């Protein structure tokens, strides 16, 4: 569903997240229009980022990465950080359920 250029951007994003968070990064899931394949050229990249912990400093790093990608590659990353524990505690959350059903694990 994702094209070669989108894959390159997402691979770079995954590498940067792994570099910054190491083992604390559990999973990245692309969801929304780019995962479904009904995006427009201006669509953002909706990414659910699952981490061992989410603190203000973690959110600041994620915001910095998103800003860097906007500057370097002219793409908008809409990053939603969630703790792994939150995901397990909310198995019936409609938003999370939909993100996992339509999503692509990176």
Label each region the model flagged.
Residues 1-26, 36-41, 51-106:
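Catalytic core of pol beta-like nucleotidyltransferases
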Residues 33:
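Conserved H-loop
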Residues 46-49:
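Short beta-strand->loop micro-motif that forms the acidic, two-metal-ion catalytic signature
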């Amino acid at each position: 569903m994702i094209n070669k250029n989108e894959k390159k951007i997402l691979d770079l994003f995954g590498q940067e997240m792994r570099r910054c968070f190491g083992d604390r990064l559990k999973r990245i899931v692309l969801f929304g229009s780019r995962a479904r394949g009904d995006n427009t050229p201006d669509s953002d990249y909706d990414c659910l980022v699952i981490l061992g912990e989410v603190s203000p400093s973690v959110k600041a790093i994620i915001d910095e990465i998103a800003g860097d990608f906007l500057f370097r590659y002219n793409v908008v990353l809409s990053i939603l950080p969630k703790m792994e524990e939150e995901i397990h505690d909310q198995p019936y959350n409609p938003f999370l359920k939909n993100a996992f059903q339509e999503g692509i694990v990176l």
